[in-house]
């Protein structure tokens, strides 16, 4: 921040090795980062024939249908993490909370309080809706700034009109 550089962090979710504790600790660590920063959340991709593929299958952490390719086309829809993708509710909970950490207008104290709720971990719908709303606000701020600078194009407007492409950083 002292040098005027905005940090960008890339995180990988949908990792079969990460535990609930790992996800909680990641959330808590990122919650200590000073604003401004952007988070880019990606879904782990296991490619057929890769070393990762072999090790995860050998250790029983994934099955052949978890490998991206012919039987699994998740990578087409889930390269960047999307809250509507079907995954375990606890994972969606942590992803939604983590997405909101990069939004300085969302109080961290609220997010930290929500992170401790066993009810919300099992029923993350309110957290997902809050994350979606925060993403819309950030997208509006970004689009407004681009429009003011004359950078907004019809192509960008069309691209952003899809819920699948909402800005989640």
Question: Predicted segment positions?
Answer:
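Short secondary-structure boundary/capping segments
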Residues: 25-26, 54-60
């Amino acid at each position: 921040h002292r040098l005027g550089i905005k940090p960008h962090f890339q995180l990988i979710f949908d990792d079969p090795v990460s535990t609930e504790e790992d996800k909680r600790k990641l959330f808590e660590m990122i919650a200590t980062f000073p604003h401004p920063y952007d988070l880019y959340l990606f879904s782990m991709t296991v490619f057929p024939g890769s070393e990762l593929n072999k090790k995860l299958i050998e250790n029983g952490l994934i099955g052949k249908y978890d490998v991206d390719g012919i039987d699994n086309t998740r990578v087409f829809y889930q390269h960047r993490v999307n809250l509507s993708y079907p995954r375990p509710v606890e994972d969606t909970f942590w992803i939604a909370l983590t997405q909101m950490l990069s939004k300085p207008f969302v109080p961290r104290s609220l997010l930290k309080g929500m992170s401790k709720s066993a009810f919300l971990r099992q029923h993350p719908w309110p957290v997902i809706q809050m994350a979606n709303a925060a993403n819309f606000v950030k997208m509006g701020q970004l689009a407004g700034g681009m429009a003011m600078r004359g950078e907004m194009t019809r192509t960008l407007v069309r691209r952003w009109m899809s819920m699948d492409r909402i800005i989640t950083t």
